[in-house]
Amino acid sequence: MKRFYIHTIGCQMNVYDSSQLSAILTAMGHRSVNAPEQADLVFVNTCTIRAKAKQKATSFVGRLAAMKRARPDMIVGVGGCLAQEEGRQLLDAFPCVDIVFGTHALGRLPGHIQAVAHQGDRIVDVEMTAAIDESVHALQGPDSSGVTGFITIMRGCDNFCTYCVVPYVRGRETSRAPEHILDEIRARVAGGLREITLLGQNVNSYGQKEGLCSFADLLARVNEIDGLHRIRFTTSHPKDLSPELAAAFTSLDKLCSHVHLPAQSGSDAVLKRMNRRYTRQAYLEKLHWLREAQPGMALSTDIIVGFPGETEQDFLQTLDLIEKVRYDSIFAFMYSDRPLAPARAFDGKVDEAEKQQRIYALLELQNRITAEKNRALEGRVEQVLVEGKSKSSGRNDITADTVQWTGRTTCNRVANFTVPRELASGNAVGPGAMVRVEIMSGLAHSLSGIAVGVEKPGAGGDAHAA
């Protein structure tokens, strides 16, 4: 038995891929440890969507060189999107690396590990395959038994936004069969999962190429799984969000009242250069469908500032969009050139100082809106799915007759709350429980409250409780 450590950089898709990698290594008879210094096998699951993510990955791999010199038998593997993009260049740049494996190579990794261990090979595997390896998805690792979790329903992307490398490093869009997805969710629910997030680069186009059921139909089937309390999904491309999907928020009781719908910009001129294939007005119409189907719907988005050619007027249109929509949260990024992405060759690059000013102004606006929306919840009772003990549990102001927990509302707001001892008796409150929490304080990025009740086991549908 060997010990392994996995370091994950990037999106939820990478988190899910790392859980699959953990399951593969566990099935090989190895066990997970908490630090690379303790491990015989060290894997870095990388991201290349932005320059900063690449820097994090290469910096971590560089730190492994000294460990490898001290323990030459240690096997180092680099996987994920950066591995897919750079391939053999990573092997040449980092002599400490033994295996470079791309986004389609997880199922072949056991053979590569054996080849390194027994023959001393150095391996690059960035081959892409048309079919999804369901044998990998069927494995359940030691880290797949949490209250909340991710499941990939598709991989790849066919949209080719001009700033993005995903179609080049994840491949073309391919959907998993609904039966395989449902079986995996049922297995995870049997292990304690209560909230699932369905993952894809564009979940709205699920099944279209293969002639499978629509994404709305898939959600309806997931909604029927006993023991599952909540359903979330990400990411949605605005151009493919349908009235059928919006209507699902009215009919499906487990579907959470939150949608992440990346706008990227509020300017039609910038959206066209990005190849987003929708206009500002079309985007706003999709939001109207969602809010009409589910009043109180929480909305989050992605925004890129400083895209090549973005003028001050373009940026002001983005700020205006944020004011108009009043998002609950925003993931904002400064544009950076990426290898393979067409925008790298675009004229009109925005200088770094201007990008810094724009992202500061954007975040200042959004922080104000988020704080206002959180304060508006004070005095309301929210249903919270308990995920674990709050980091605040050790604070001096937490008294002996209370316990501090954390979880999320259906609108995806973090809620930290105290549970009076009389309510906590009998272990009714714990990870996986659904608790009614009175919000006492709306903070900048979270809510604080006190538990006032606990849902009965099996009372899962809380998607419309805000």
Swiss-Prot record:
The gene is miaB. This is tRNA-2-methylthio-N(6)-dimethylallyladenosine synthase. Residues 2-118 form the MTTase N-terminal domain. It is found in: Cytoplasm. Its EC number is 2.8.4.3. It catalyses: N(6)-dimethylallyladenosine(37) in tRNA + (sulfur carrier)-SH + AH2 + 2 S-adenosyl-L-methionine = 2-methylsulfanyl-N(6)-dimethylallyladenosine(37) in tRNA + (sulfur carrier)-H + 5'-deoxyadenosine + L-methionine + A + S-adenosyl-L-homocysteine + 2 H(+). It comes from Desulfosudis oleivorans (strain DSM 6200 / JCM 39069 / Hxd3). Binds 2 [4Fe-4S] clusters. One cluster is coordinated with 3 cysteines and an exchangeable S-adenosyl-L-methionine. [4Fe-4S] cluster 2 binds at residues 157, 161, 164. GO terms for cellular component: cytosol. It is an enzyme of class 2 (transferase). Its main location: cytoplasm. Catalyzes the methylthiolation of N6-(dimethylallyl)adenosine (i(6)A), leading to the formation of 2-methylthio-N6-(dimethylallyl)adenosine (ms(2)i(6)A) at position 37 in tRNAs that read codons beginning with uridine. Monomer.
